[in-house]
Amino acid sequence: MLKRSLLFLTVLLLLFSFSSITNEVSASSSFDKGKYKKGDDASYFEPTGPYLMVNVTGVDSKGNELLSPHYVEFPIKPGTTLTKEKIEYYVEWALDATAYKEFRVVELDPSAKIEVTYYDKNKKKEETKSFPITEKGFVVPDLSEHIKNPGFNLITKVVIEKK
């Protein structure tokens, strides 16, 4: 009887220990490591290739600061079009990272633009390109011959309101 109980407990213990290992393996394999590269910190992953960095300050219609979320980086692909609607969508995601589903974007600052700075190998100098945010949008240029991970930066104030 004692041998049977010990055998049963051993089998039960082994089942529980292996189930925790397989859950960790399946969780780690579902993360697409191809889109991100590991930074200095083990918990930080930087996008590989072009990315849109959204760094905004949420203000009310009178200009009072309501929210200042951390910047968020979104992978983007050369050749895709970034319209005003898509950019507002990314901004709302950045707001949700700090205050989930609390605020909605009313409008972007009219002077808001997206900028990318890189070293132009042909001109042998640093270049900054600016792209206005419009309904029609702009096509993300392929800068792979100049820089590996070009960061397209949106740093602006955004009029927001509570949902």
Swiss-Prot record:
The keyword Secreted applies. It is found in: Secreted. It comes from the Bacteria. Keywords: Plasminogen activation, Secreted, Signal. Disulfide bonds: none annotated. Residues 1-27 form the signal peptide. Its main location: secreted. One of its GO terms (cellular component) is extracellular region. InterPro entries: SAK, SAK/SK_sf. SUPFAM superfamilies: Staphylokinase/streptokinase (SSF54328). Belongs to the staphylokinase family. Potent plasminogen activator that converts plasminogen into plasmin. It forms a 1:1 complex with plasmin, which in turn activates other plasminogen molecules. This is Staphylokinase. It comes from Staphylococcus aureus (strain N315).
